[in-house]
């Protein structure tokens, strides 16, 4: 797949760190996985899509703790997907793609989850609409990311803007809620929490209700 801007910078940055990503961010990955999984309304035989699956850490954990769940991942970085393919069972399908243009037909998934990906998305409304498109009616989006309500996250974002050109922006809870509603989600809920002194996160949930 030909990489489209602005994901060229994301691909370049994560291709460079893919081999050490899991080690470098081990605490953050573990903490965000636990918080996200705790908020996933998983049912028997649900089909789940992980958008921005990276090296497959969340999919690997879900395959362990919820084995009946049918799992699919998508990510724009081939180097990260290569690592994911080595660690994941062969029945977990992995695809190259980006949030604004998912390579799936309509209404394919019961759950769409995205963990620590949204701050890279240049067109957030397009991405939210696209994730809703692949949800079946009644399906849910569960999105975990940095939260701009926290001062330390806002300061860290300023630092990231100086050193990481792939970074787009983080959002406050009211911005996230507004975008979810504008994108057609119902029953929008957002929880905020901290995993340490630096990282303040939010997990947003919205339901795809058929018009």
Predicted feature descriptions by range:
Residues 111-123:
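A short SAM/SAH-binding and catalytic strip from SAM-dependent methyltransferases
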Residues 125-137:
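A short glycine-rich, Lys/Arg-flanked "PGG" loop and its adjoining helix->strand segment in the class I
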Residues 204-211:
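C-terminal lobe and adjacent flexible extensions of AdoMet/dcAdoMet transferase-like proteins
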Residues 49-51, 55-101:
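Class I SAM-dependent methyltransferase SAM/SAH-binding core
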Residues 100-111:
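A short acidic, Gly/Pro-enriched loop at the edge of an enzyme's catalytic core
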Residues 47, 138-140:
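Short glycine-centered segments of the SAM/dcSAM-binding site in methyltransferase folds
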Residues 1-42, 57-61, 80-83, 156, ...:
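Conserved class I S-adenosyl-L-methionine
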Residues 4-8, 25, 142-201:
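C-terminal alpha-helical "lid/dimerization" subdomain adjacent to the S-adenosyl-L-methionine
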């Amino acid at each position: 797949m030909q990489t489209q801007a602005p994901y060229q910078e994301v691909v370049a940055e994560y291709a460079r760190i893919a081999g050490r990503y899991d080690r470098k961010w081990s605490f953050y990955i573990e903490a965000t996985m636990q918080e996200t999984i705790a908020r996933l309304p998983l049912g028997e035989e649900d089909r789940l899509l992980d958008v921005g699956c990276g090296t497959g850490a969340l999919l690997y954990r879900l395959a362990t703790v919820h084995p009946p769940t049918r799992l699919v991942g998508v990510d724009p970085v081939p180097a990260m997907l290569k690592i994911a393919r080595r660690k994941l069972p062969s029945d977990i399908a992995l695809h190259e793609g980006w949030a604004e243009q998912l390579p799936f037909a309509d209404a394919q998934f019961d759950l769409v989850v995205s963990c620590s990906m949204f701050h890279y998305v240049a067109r957030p409304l397009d991405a939210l609409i696209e994730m809703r498109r692949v949800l079946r009616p009644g399906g849910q989006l569960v999105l975990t990311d940095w939260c701009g309500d926290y001062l330390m996250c806002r300061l860290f974002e300023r630092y990231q803007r100086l050193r990481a050109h792939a970074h787009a922006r983080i959002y406050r809870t009211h911005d996230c809620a507004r975008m979810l509603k504008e994108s057609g989600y119902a029953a929008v809920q957002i929880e905020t929490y901290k995993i340490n002194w630096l990282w303040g996160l939010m997990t947003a949930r919205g339901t795809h209700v058929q018009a």
